[in-house]
Amino acid sequence: MKKSKFLSLATIISLILLTFSFSFAFDKIKFVAISDPHISIPQQKGVTDGYKLGLKTQMLTENTVAEINKIPDLKFVLVAGDLTQDAEPWNIDELRKILDGLKVPYFVTLGNHDLSRVPHEKKDQPITLSKYTVAGAFIGRSGGMVPGMTYYSHEVAKDLVLITLDTSRAQIFVPEAGLNDFGARIDPGQMRWLENTLKANQKKTIIILTHHSAVPWCEGDKSNHNAWRWFWMDNAEEVRALLKKYGVKLVFSGHRHISTRYQQVDDIYHFVHPALSTYPMRYTVYEMTPKDLSWQVKDVPASPEVWELAKKNFLADKWWRGPDHTETPEGNQKYLEFYESPATLKGKLTYK
């Protein structure tokens, strides 16, 4: 009788522990997010140091990888798109070589600079690589990526699933904007795939990795100042509704070139990440549990001369300035504060 009671008690305890382990499959996990390296080999014709430090992108990305490799207990790295200058094969090869130097797995998503621009009679466009070819370069490195697909899912830890999205539209030159279309939309086929993937992973924690945001980051993004409406998805409301339906909490993006910060919309936390290639040149270290997320933003290692050049070129640029970022001391300060975001260099949130 005593033995029977003991076995029953042991069974109950085992079931409780098993349930607990399934509910919280990962206890704490550390990872890094980087974005917009815009790799361009310095010897490439036409590469310069402008707003994007084209001649320095190789060095800046190498330095970042070296620093990331010093982080203890790191599990993986996320790369939020705009991998290259404009999908040049030599730049893809170079980025692959640099990222392969990471000591942990890395996972990429594609940005608007990772597909070939469409030739236009009013603007010469070099023919570079198809986005399917760019994505294919990372098969075997970004787990879950398969031939013929530009988006994928992968279980990066027990019951922690990464879902990457391909947000970019065709790179068609838009004469009235004087720019290639760098906007975003999740097409119907990808939306169906996303819902099926979310449905299959309802009991797991989800991280969405995308280049374009599903939210605007300033009034200029909403009002289409300098074509800034292209910084976030055309069908953002539809995408957010689907993510909310399946209880997604975290969406990580790049593209906007502003320092790390987040918005909470419908209980979803939308994070944006700075570029490695433009001022303020940063990456972000995260620690995550099933209940909360903390982060710390780090500067990319570079010489004082490089930092001075990056800031000088940043301040000289007009296109990236918002409507209230006038070329005055006060306007410059607002411009710097918006991109640097000193109040969000570190933080912690608990999911609702």
Locate the predicted segments by residue:
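Extended active-site neighborhood of metal-dependent phosphoesterases/phosphodiesterases
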Residues: 89-200, 244, 266, 270, ...
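Active-site-proximal beta-strand elements of phosphoester/diester hydrolases
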Residues: 28-44, 159-173, 209, 269-274, ...
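Active-site environment of divalent metal-dependent phosphoester hydrolases
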Residues: 40-43, 85-88, 110-120, 169-173, ...
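A short C-terminal boundary segment appended to hydrolase-like catalytic domains
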Residues: 289-352
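Acidic/histidine-rich helix-loop elements
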Residues: 35-61, 116-138, 171-186, 222-230, ...
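Bacterial N-terminal signal peptides
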Residues: 10-19
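His/acidic metal-ligating clusters that form di-metal
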Residues: 64-76, 161-163, 175-269, 321-345
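N-terminal active-site segment of His-dependent metallophosphoesterases
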Residues: 24-89
